[in-house]
C-alpha cells in the first residue's frame, strides 16, 4: 500500500514490478484442529493464492505468505474455511520500519487463533480482534499498521462471514455477476482505516483504528460461487468489469483453472498499474477528491485469494 500515516507526499512514485510468487491450496491440507471432524457431505472451498510484489524483495524478506508489504493466510478447520489478507502501510518505510512485517504478524496471529478449541468460524471480526490483541500485547510488539480483510465459510450453513477494515476487500461472484462487494473505509483519499501498534512515545502521530470498527457481513453461498479477497493493489488498478471478464472466462472450477484465472487477474492488474495513460479506479478516485495525480495505474503490491464453493460428489 502506498499511503500516508498522517503525513502523505503529494505525488506517488512508480516502481517496476519484477517478482511473482504463487501458492495453491486445496482445502483440508492445513486441517489441524482436533476438536471435531468434517462431514464428507459438507461444502468446501477450492482455494488458490496469487500475488506480485511491486519490486524485488530485499535479502532476508523471502518469507512465505508475503507479497512485498502484503500478507495473507488460508486455513481449514473442522467447522470453517478461513482466509485473510492484510496490506502493510507503506509510510512506515520512511521511519526505517519493514512495512510488511506488521501485516505478516497480524495474519499469523489470526491464523493461530483459528486453531483454538473455541473457534466457531462465524465471527471473523472477533477473530480479527483476538489476533490484533495477541499481536499488540506482546512483550515486544511489532511496530506498524495494516488494513485487514478476513472471511470464513462455515461448513454447516454454507454461509460466508466477513470482516473488513480499510481498503482491502472481497467480492462474491455468482452466475457471472457480482453479488456482494465490500465497501472501503477511509479517513481521507488513500488513507484507509488501519490497525496500528505505534511507538510508545509517538502514539498521537498515527491513525489507531480499532478492530471492532471492521464492517461485518454474512452471505449465503451456493455451489459454484466464487469468493475473492484482495488488497487494494488489485482494486485500485482493475475495474470490476475487467475482473469479471477474466473470472467469467474460467471453464472449470478446479485448482488448476482457478490458479490460471488468478494469475491472469494479477498479471493484468500489474500491467495496468504500470500504464501511465490508463484511467484506473485509483486515478478516477483521485480526481473525485481533487488530488493532484497524473493519471494511470498505481504501482503496488497485489495479493489475491480466489475460492470456488464446491460440494462433494455423492
UniProtKB/Swiss-Prot annotation:
Instruction: Show the SUPFAM superfamilies listed in the entry.
Output: PP2C-like
Which keywords annotate this record? Answer: Hydrolase, Magnesium, Manganese, Metal-binding, Protein phosphatase
**Disulfide partners:** none
The family database entries (InterPro entries) matched by this protein are listed as:
PPM-type-like_dom_sf, PPM-type_phosphatase-like_dom, PPTC7
Q: Which GO biological process annotations does it have?
A: dephosphorylation
Q: What Gene3D superfamilies does its record include?
A: PPM-type phosphatase domain
Is the Ligase keyword given for this protein? no
Q: Which cofactor does it need?
A: Mg(2+); Mn(2+)
- In the UniProt record, does the keyword Metal-binding occur? yes
Q: List positions binding Mn(2+) 2.
A: 87, 232
Question: One MF term from GO for this chain?
Answer: protein serine/threonine phosphatase activity
GO CC annotations, alphabetized: mitochondrion
Amino-acid positions noted as binding Mn(2+) 1 in the UniProt annotation, renumbered to this chain: 87-88
Q: Which Pfam families match?
A: SpoIIE
Enzyme Commission number(s) of this protein: 3.1.3.16
Q: Which PANTHER family match?
A: PROTEIN PHOSPHATASE 2C, PROTEIN PHOSPHATASE PTC7 HOMOLOG
What family does this chain come from, according to its entry? Answer: Belongs to the PP2C family.
What protein name is recorded for this chain? Answer: Protein phosphatase PTC7 homolog fig
**Organism (species):** Drosophila sechellia (Fruit fly)
Q: From the UniProt record, report the name of the gene that encodes this protein.
A: fig
